[in-house]
């Protein structure tokens, strides 16, 4: 996918919201939290089942293409459910999504996504913006949130290692939002 084809945070957010509005009888759009730079973290639930499959991307900017791909997959599932399509010879989308839900979180870390797209100037908070500029890290290589924390290493595990003063496991809004979803939903698979 070329850079011209990629969506901005706002485009992806509103495309997910529109899917929730259009297919409201089997799709739910919701905000699961806010980033440290006050961007909303969207999630789209497709299907009616109690058990949930979570599809997660956008944890860091290296996932640059994945949010757009998840959005495309979400659109395909919505159209397939509404039209009662069968994929291949035996994959009945409606039958599947009446038993399980696919919960898509295409952009857990919208701040990193925006930094990669627009540079450190995309950060609204002047203190965070200046702190990030002082790290002298190229925006193309940036993988953290607006506070400079790598979310991949912010989960409370037995192997957690503190990298900075005042950094604790699950110290970040984005991490806490995902943990909250894990605790709320009955999961069968995380991809």
Language-model-detected regions and their locations in the chain:
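Active-site/substrate-binding loop(s) of hydrolase catalytic cores
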Residues: 50, 64-188
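Short glycine-rich loop/turn motifs
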Residues: 39-43, 148
């Amino acid at each position: 996918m070329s850079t011209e084809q990629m969506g901005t945070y706002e485009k992806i957010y509103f495309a997910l919201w529109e899917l929730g509005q259009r297919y409201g009888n089997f799709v739910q759009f919701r905000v699961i939290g806010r980033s440290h730079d006050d961007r909303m973290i969207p999630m789209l639930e497709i299907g009616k089942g109690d058990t949930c499959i979570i599809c997660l991307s956008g944890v860091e900017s290296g996932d640059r293409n994945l949010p757009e791909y998840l959005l495309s997959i979400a659109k395909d599932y919505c159209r397939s459910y509404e039209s009662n399509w069968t994929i291949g010879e035996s994959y009945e989308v409606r039958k599947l999504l009446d038993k399980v839900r696919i919960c898509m979180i295409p952009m857990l870390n919208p701040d990193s996504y925006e930094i990669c797209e627009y540079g450190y100037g995309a950060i609204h908070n002047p203190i965070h913006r200046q702190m990030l500029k002082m790290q002298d890290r190229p925006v193309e290589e940036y993988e953290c949130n607006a506070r400079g924390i790598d979310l991949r290493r912010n989960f409370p595990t037995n192997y957690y290692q503190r990298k900075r003063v005042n950094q604790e496991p699950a110290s970040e809004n984005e991490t806490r939002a995902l943990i909250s979803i894990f605790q709320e939903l009955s999961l069968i698979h995380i991809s």
